[in-house]
Every structure is written in structure tokens, then in C-alpha cells.
Amino acid sequence: SATGCGQMTFNQKLAGHWVSGSCESAGSGSYIKRDFTLTESTWKLNATVYNDAACTVKFLGLDIAGPYTVVQESTAVAGATEVNYQVTDRRLIPLSDGAVQLLMQGKCGAGPWAVNQIADIALTGCAPLGFPSNAQCPGGELDLNQIDGNNLFFGDRSADLCKARPTKLGAYPVTRAQ
């Protein structure tokens, strides 16, 4: 429901379907396309990681979901809002032999890994990819969001979001899908 004077809450503004406008650099020679679905209380991310800048060679799929809580307006970034994203579901889908080989290198899921086989990593995390287990990040990810027209920005991903909230926004927004 709306707040006084017909103003929408930040949760209401977040609710919707948001997608990458293009192939985004994810660092280390990998690229990503993100697809978020948010309600007024839950979030879901379906992401695909690619090996090429045109996003044609699939490497890995990632599905993450859970509830979220709007905390307050950011004191570090003007116009942004602090949001905590809890993770209840975290699944990986290796989409290439290279992804299978990477996932077999360290503690990542219960294994064994196979191309196109979904594996839940919520309990184990995935050290080779830098994903904590749910127990290692009990408060969820401490993030920032800013809505600018039809663009939704998240916080910069360079820090450990289990321990510290970003102090700047990421370079790539997702766009509200119609």
C-alpha cells in the first residue's frame, strides 16, 4: 500500500522485472547478463556468466533468491537506499566443461558436477567463485540500490558484502522490463 500523500514506498518502486541492457563486464575476462524479479518483500536473480564480450559463449548459470529488507536512505551515496538481501536459495548450473572443471577445484556444493546439472550451494558456498555459504553470511548481503528512471543500480561488488555495505554504485544498471 502507498504511504501518505500518494507516495510509493521504496519496496513498491523496486517491485518488478529488471534485466541487463547489454553484456556486462564481470572482471577476469568474464561477462554477465542479469535478470532480477522483485516483489515488495522478495528478490530473485537469474544470471548467466559468459566467456566472451558478446555474451554468446555460456559458462555458468546462477540462481539466487530470498527476502529483502529496506534499511534506510544511504548516508554514503546521495539518492541511494540501503537494502539487505537475505539468501535462502543459491544454485549453480555449470554450462560448460570449463565451469565443471572450475567447480571441481574447491569446496563448492556437494558434487559431483556435470554440465547442465543444477546444484544447491546454499549450505557449502563456493570458494572458487567467492560465494559464501548461508551460514557464513547470516545477515545477507549489505547492498545499495538507486532507481533512476527505468534503471536500477546495485552497489559496487568489489567488497565482501557480508561484512560491509558498498560506498558507491556499480557501473551497470538493470532496466525495468515492460
Protein language model features and the residues they cover:
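N-terminal helix-cap/turn-to-beta initiation motif at the start of protein domains
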Residues: 4-21, 31, 35-37
